[in-house]
């Protein structure tokens, strides 16, 4: 899809061998599994020496702040935040919650890139994640 291609382009443009990609909201869309290398794929980030880790949300849908703190390392270069629930049962993330998460992450590692997959986000609020600290926002195109 166009969104997956935009996400892949943003990831591959900002990550280098030895870098780590972190998802603090659990597993991404299945279309990204091959891009990241969760499912082996030719040309994946994993094939280029980029590692991936994720921190699942807590059972009540809240962020696992302790888990996120422990998952941020020196080589964590980019944090990807999927706004839409996708195929999960969690609620869609509000811009306010995304802002709280980005603030928490940037307080730990100010130079990390926070990228938001804003799929369907334009239908629910009048603010965008860029207004609350996101460095990159994806919605079928890169902003």
Regions found by a protein language model. Give the residues of each.
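Conserved PLP-enzyme active-site core in the AAT-like
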Residues: 2-143
């Amino acid at each position: 899809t166009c969104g997956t291609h935009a996400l892949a382009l943003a990831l591959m443009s900002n990550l280098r061998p030895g870098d780590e990609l972190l998802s603090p909201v659990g597993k991404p869309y299945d279309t990204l599994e091959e891009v990241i290398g969760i499912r082996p794929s030719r040309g994946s980030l994993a094939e280029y020496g980029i590692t991936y880790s994720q921190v699942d949300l807590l059972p009540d849908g809240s962020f696992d702040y302790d888990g996120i703190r422990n998952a941020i390392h020196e080589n964590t270069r980019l944090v990807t935040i999927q706004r839409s629930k996708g195929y999960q049962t969690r609620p869609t993330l509000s811009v306010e919650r995304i802002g709280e998460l980005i603030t928490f992450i940037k307080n730990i590692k100010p130079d990390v890139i926070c990228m938001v997959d804003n799929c369907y986000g334009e239908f629910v609020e009048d603010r965008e994640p860029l207004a609350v600290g996101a460095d990159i926002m994806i919605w079928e195109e890169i902003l």
